[in-house]
């Protein structure tokens, strides 16, 4: 069967655009921090275009790795799907409350975590939040269970945490549904280890609600003491974490409940499935390396 020239041109352009899209992180002109002798290398085992029919569980873990969710939100693998080239995590109301570990769960969320970790690099995703009181997030955290000594401490790098419906009257929550809420956390310091406990924040305005449109949320984990946050390819803030961020961390895409943004009286699940779904079009992780040329 002969293929038309127009069809071949279309396919070629499509393949070229896909390839080009993965040559470097999403930066606006003049924002790429790489030097002339450097290039961005895509880290395949921490990146995904979500083009398949089901999530790649060799790359992503969807059961929570022992973390079942903060009550009243329970992580459910059935709430995670791939649809039209996107990863979707849908919030739900459970048919009946479930009691686990003496805690009552009434809602369902979802957890997607990378099986592989990395240190310094650039991490980004294109995400649109759900409209509910539950979260839409993109972040990194270390895993201390197999670590020794002071490396058992916790380091967490929150690139974006938002909600679609604010149910808390606190001043700091006023714009949580329309900002890029970024953070660095240091906690669980083992006894005898001289690391600071605390948090250092970054913030940027989205120009609308987090659920109204897709945004590209990114972070350049430049060094142990310099974190730079990007929104839609533009640098927003630089943060010095409270302790050295030099431990390998793993990606997390999580939809959960927050105890500081409680369930509304109507249960918060009255919207359509689309309204109740957080969508990730892609996630990409990069390392800055010396050019081969």
Swiss-Prot record:
Residue span(s) of domain GH16: 38-291
Stated name of the protein: Beta-porphyranase B
Alphabetic keyword roster: Glycosidase, Hydrolase, Periplasm, Signal
Coiled-coil residues: none
Signal peptide start-end: 1-21
UniProt function note: Cleaves the sulfated polysaccharide porphyran at the (1->4) linkages between beta-D-galactopyranose and alpha-L-galactopyranose-6-sulfate, forming mostly the disaccharide alpha-L-galactopyranose-6-sulfate-(1->3)-beta-D-galactose. Some longer oligosaccharides of even number of residues are also observed. Inactive on the non-sulfated agarose portion of the porphyran backbone. In contrast to PorA, tolerates the presence of 3-6-anhydro-L-galactose in subsite -2.
EC number(s) reported in the record: 3.2.1.178
The keyword Signal is annotated on this UniProt entry: yes
Biological process, per Gene Ontology: carbohydrate metabolic process
Domain of life: Bacteria
Matches recorded under InterPro entries: ConA-like_dom_sf, GH16
